[in-house]
A protein has these predicted regions:
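Binuclear metal-dependent hydrolase catalytic cores
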Residues: 1-166
Length: 166
């Protein structure tokens, strides 16, 4: 089983600011030495020794969490902007069964759905689940003019199910 947070930000997706990027660059420059630049191997060793806060970013995409059960089946919790990158990873999979759980219909939990590449792959089977009734109607409205050029009925194998959690 594998899991990954593809988005953790609430409300609005936000890219890395210029100030934060400059802070990371300054940190790298303060740590580097001439010997770290001598060869490909020394550069790779230096880069791999840098702390995660310098070499990665967190918090840019809105809510999306993946739990991979197998190579052919994945569970996704919420579909914020992080689902777009996840979809790019999943698009190469054949005959993939995808389960998407939508906790609620706030924009930051659904705004990545129209850009989820497996929607446009006839080999993908996508199941939606929500504790709220009306998910299919709500998503059909989101994937309709003037909000999006491709109607949900033009997407491939989609199933919808309301969950009674009480």
């Amino acid at each position: 089983m594998r899991y990954k947070f593809w988005g953790v930000r609430g409300s609005v997706p936000t890219s890395l600011s210029s100030d934060k990027l400059m802070s990371k660059i300054h940190s790298i420059l303060q740590q580097i030495s001439v010997s770290d630049l001598e060869s490909v191997t020394s550069r790779e060793k230096f880069i791999s020794s840098l702390p995660k806060w310098v070499t990665s970013t967190v918090g840019g995409n809105t809510t999306c969490f993946e739990v991979g059960i197998s190579e052919k089946e994945v569970f996704i919790f919420d579909a914020g902007t992080g689902i777009r990158e996840l979809g790019k990873k999943l698009i190469s999979e054949k005959n993939l069964k995808i389960h998407i759980f939508i906790s609620h219909f706030h924009w930051d939990h659904i705004q990545g759905l129209p850009f989820f590449d497996p929607f446009f792959n006839p080999k993908s089977e996508i199941h939606f689940y929500s504790p709220k009734d009306g998910l299919k109607d709500f998503l059909e409205q989101q994937a309709d003019s003037p909000y999006f050029p491709v109607k949900m009925k033009n997407m491939y194998i989609l199933y919808f199910r309301s969950l009674n959690l009480l």
